[in-house]
UniProtKB/Swiss-Prot annotation:
This is Protein TusC. Belongs to the DsrF/TusC family. Keywords: Cytoplasm, tRNA processing. One of its GO terms (cellular component) is cytoplasm. One of its GO terms (biological process) is tRNA processing. Pfam families: DsrE. The lineage of its organism: Bacteria, Pseudomonadati, Pseudomonadota, Gammaproteobacteria, Enterobacterales. It comes from Buchnera aphidicola subsp. Acyrthosiphon pisum (strain APS) (Acyrthosiphon pisum symbiotic bacterium).
Length: 119
């Protein structure tokens, strides 16, 4: 069985990569049984609750992350160093229940996937 990892490495607003990444996950979820989602770099900003993108005339798609569990996508990982670099920590109240991993263990996890798709 092929395993696919989606990596979100860009901030949520200003570009459409986050929304496109979610759309891609939902589109291929019926094809691949093992899909995991990783948040690294500015991608960790996708996880912050109570964002108000309408103030910059952007659509708030981040609430769509909450339906990942309906697609049986439960392996969600975040880079601890990326959180700390942005003044966040694993005690923050994020929109998802995520496993926070150090950079080394995050790389070890990613090494197990057949395909890695970056958004």
């Amino acid at each position: 069985m092929k395993m696919v990892a989606f990596v979100f490495s860009h901030a949520p607003h200003g570009i459409s990569l986050g929304r496109e990444g979610l759309d891609a996950i939902f589109s291929i979820s019926s094809i691949f049984k093992k899909i995991s989602v990783f948040f690294i770099g500015d991608g960790v900003l996708q996880l912050i609750k109570n964002q108000q993108p309408e103030h910059i005339l952007a659509r708030n798609y981040t609430s769509s992350f909450s339906i990942l569990s309906l697609y049986n996508i439960k392996d969600l990982y975040c880079c601890k160093a990326s959180l700390l670099e942005r003044g966040l920590n694993n005690n923050n109240n994020f929109i998802l229940n995520i496993d926070v991993l150090d950079s080394y263990n995050l790389r070890l996890k990613l090494d197990n996937y057949d395909a890695i798709i970056n958004f």
